[in-house]
Amino acid sequence: MYSGAGPALAPPAPPPPIQGYAFKPPPRPDFGTSGRTIKLQANFFEMDIPKIDIYHYELDIKPEKCPRRVNREIVEHMVQHFKTQIFGDRKPVFDGRKNLYTAMPLPIGRDKVELEVTLPGEGKDRIFKVSIKWVSCVSLQALHDALSGRLPSVPFETIQALDVVMRHLPSMRYTPVGRSFFTASEGCSNPLGGGREVWFGFHQSVRPSLWKMMLNIDVSATAFYKAQPVIEFVCEVLDFKSIEEQQKPLTDSQRVKFTKEIKGLKVEITHCGQMKRKYRVCNVTRRPASHQTFPLQQESGQTVECTVAQYFKDRHKLVLRYPHLPCLQVGQEQKHTYLPLEVCNIVAGQRCIKKLTDNQTSTMIRATARSAPDRQEEISKLMRSASFNTDPYVREFGIMVKDEMTDVTGRVLQPPSILYGGRNKAIATPVQGVWDMRNKQFHTGIEIKVWAIACFAPQRQCTEVHLKSFTEQLRKISRDAGMPIQGQPCFCKYAQGADSVEPMFRHLKNTYAGLQLVVVILPGKTPVYAEVKRVGDTVLGMATQCVQMKNVQRTTPQTLSNLCLKINVKLGGVNNILLPQGRPPVFQQPVIFLGADVTHPPAGDGKKPSIAAVVGSMDAHPNRYCATVRVQQHRQEIIQDLAAMVRELLIQFYKSTRFKPTRIIFYRDGVSEGQFQQVLHHELLAIREACIKLEKDYQPGITFIVVQKRHHTRLFCTDKNERVGKSGNIPAGTTVDTKITHPTEFDFYLCSHAGIQGTSRPSHYHVLWDDNRFSSDELQILTYQLCHTYVRCTRSVSIPAPAYYAHLVAFRARYHLVDKEHDSAEGSHTSGQSNGRDHQALAKAVQVHQDTLRTMYFA
């Protein structure tokens, strides 16, 4: 079972002692050589850095907690005001919080200096106290030493300092968001609906690479709220043509929807002339402005209840046009400050952190997808307009940035051969990341004898004629694919609503012995889906396959074939395998592939738990996987219960194969650079603990690889003839491990998929630990081959199958958590802890039924 070609791997290195040990990522073993070379350009721009010292000062601004924008203004005023005494011609740069850097030391020595700065404000000036204290000298010489490999690690504080220098000017010109800068499009707006619009901008970060510092520049886009009157915002959110059609108070459901959208946003008032005070919305009143009262203190000192409408009439001589609409409650909840909608505007420049709707997402993608050559041109334009070499702050520190993208030599790896089954055991060879199943049969097809259909689409839209023809077509395609469906379904009925799912499924399970599959037909987006998965996966342990009504009304061989790919795997079949002779040497001994991911609830949802998922391969192909899943603390990135999860998977692997893995290859998704150290430390120890708990001398070699897709590295073909497809992307299998990668550590970029829309995003792999002493070629080829083992399609996908499956398992668990009385998977109206259920109840909700546990229910 475990035989493979090629040289044997070096034996795993003995693990170092566990206690008090800071794990260091391994050095790069070598550079890859496999594959044909390809000339590329990367959106990295070389920086020329002088070998000087930079002076780092700490600022303390009182009152604290001002937004960064205000802090920047304060510092700007301070530098102007104290020019003669302190700053002279120096141009300090500031990070908006506490850190200030100068190219020449300030004449204050080591002492703390206290200054007073006045900001002219609307109405009255604001006074701030600022203290400056010297922190350290940041040596750029040390950076040069690290980049050339003379120092073991890149000094973080130098990169931070350079980042602040490069961001200082753009931060004052644009709206910063994370590492990107945005501005509203001049002259043309890109509405998304619901009071939101697209803003375009650019990402910028300073990155160490081999021998050079690089500036990574990319175009980016994000959703902002439209600056508009709140009255117009209400119309957009609630789909009114105009406010005139809403002559009566909002209904409860309208108010809830509106509250959900506006809560937390800043508004400015329009009824006080030039004084446009800003407030944050904390709620929307239940009562309209004509009935909403608050305690008003009169001149006589006594307090009377007054309505908001009356107050505006008396105090501001303003008769409200829409007294029947509610008010915004602003500021602190306990303070009872109410503003009628009609005197408020949404403040410009607020980013939308709430989840976009499906329609908004597709509009966003349409507005932002750029073919690779277009994106390349846009990035070059950006560089010209940013013109860093004329930026006075960048020049102050003697930094120069090249205008051209960096040339990089990549390699296009050979795809693996894919082995099918049936009589002819056909072999497919992927071309551009895609292959075809025509005239091929599953490696191991399942025979389906007892199956049912439950149709939740209305009978008048999805008729019995549709169902009959769908069944015939599905049986034909499945027979060709080597997964014969014998006979008609044993049950075929219509049903309505999520409430009928459980009784119907119970009836099916009790009535039809040996029932293998329920095909469920859904009318578009519906809560029925979550309920089908909850009942099928967690309550009764039944295999379910959902199909959209439109794919039943009009079948195509492609959709039916894709359906078969999923069904065969859910029932325990194997669609195809990597050709055994073509696999890398790691397969010579038993090896388990683990994929892990943590998904977090959407931003703005303060209570829902995060979900951690780990999957493990269960055969030598590797094709079949088993899943484990846990709920954990909200937004917790480290997998808390990893030791127990890995232990479960190792036991399951042994049950399936009768082997103990001698190697564990762990692909970890969803970790950002800042968390590498933490995650590695906790999770590597957890994997080791899982092994030792099984047998005290069991020490398989562990390789820990972080997979990242959320980065801004983009690669472009230098030669137009190399471009692939309509969007002109790099070919599938393109790998880069020089020039733009880490100066000393083991990382690489691999674009394993064929880009269909927009510009391909290569995945970034960073090896944080490697007992198995992989060479670059071997790990890159292994990773690329695993991208071809994803069962849902006959294409190579953008990350290795185990990492992808972990993502699917976590995503499915979100559906298991849906509380059908209260919320939908998109986000609940109540922001309670998944509606007040405690940790135990949530943990139970994601627990998969015993019969489902060993199947690939998530496929």
UniProtKB/Swiss-Prot annotation:
Activity modulation notes: Inhibited by EDTA.
Disulfide linkage: none
Domain spans labelled PAZ: 229-348
Any one GO molecular function term: mRNA 3'-UTR AU-rich region binding
GO cellular component: cytoplasm; cytoplasmic ribonucleoprotein granule; cytosol; dendrite; extracellular exosome; glutamatergic synapse; membrane; nucleoplasm
Effect of H203Q: In LESKRES; impairs shRNA-mediated silencing. Does not affect targeting to P-bodies. Increases binding to mRNA targets. Does not affect interaction with DICER1. Does not affect phosphorylation of the C-terminal serine cluster
The keyword Ubl conjugation belongs to this UniProt entry's keyword annotation: yes
EC class name: hydrolase
Effect listed in the UniProt record for changing E683G: No effect on RNA cleavage
Domain annotation Piwi: ranges: 517-818
Subcellular location: Cytoplasm, P-body; Nucleus
Catalytic activity: Endonucleolytic cleavage to 5'-phosphomonoester
Modified residues (3'-nitrotyrosine): Y2
Function (record text): Required for RNA-mediated gene silencing (RNAi) by the RNA-induced silencing complex (RISC). The 'minimal RISC' appears to include AGO2 bound to a short guide RNA such as a microRNA (miRNA) or short interfering RNA (siRNA). These guide RNAs direct RISC to complementary mRNAs that are targets for RISC-mediated gene silencing. The precise mechanism of gene silencing depends on the degree of complementarity between the miRNA or siRNA and its target. Binding of RISC to a perfectly complementary mRNA generally results in silencing due to endonucleolytic cleavage of the mRNA specifically by AGO2.
Subunit field text: Interacts with DICER1 through its Piwi domain and with TARBP2 during assembly of the RNA-induced silencing complex (RISC). Together, DICER1, AGO2 and TARBP2 constitute the trimeric RISC loading complex (RLC), or micro-RNA (miRNA) loading complex (miRLC). Within the RLC/miRLC, DICER1 and TARBP2 are required to process precursor miRNAs (pre-miRNAs) to mature miRNAs and then load them onto AGO2. AGO2 bound to the mature miRNA constitutes the minimal RISC and may subsequently dissociate from DICER1 and TARBP2. Note however that the term RISC has also been used to describe the trimeric RLC/miRLC. (Microbial infection) Interacts with Epstein-Barr virus (EBV) tegument protein BGLF2; this interaction participates in the regulation of cellular miRNA by the virus, leading to enhanced SUMOylation.
Assigned protein family: Belongs to the argonaute family. Ago subfamily.
Medical condition linked: Lessel-Kreienkamp syndrome: An autosomal dominant disorder characterized by global developmental delay, intellectual disability of variable degree, and speech and language delay apparent from infancy or early childhood. Behavioral disorders are observed in most patients. Additional variable features include seizures, hypotonia, gait abnormalities, visual and cardiac defects, and non-specific facial dysmorphism.
PANTHER family found in the cross-reference section: EUKARYOTIC TRANSLATION INITIATION FACTOR 2C (PTHR22891)
UniProt name for this protein: Protein argonaute-2
Source organism of the structure: Homo sapiens
Name of the gene this protein is made from: AGO2
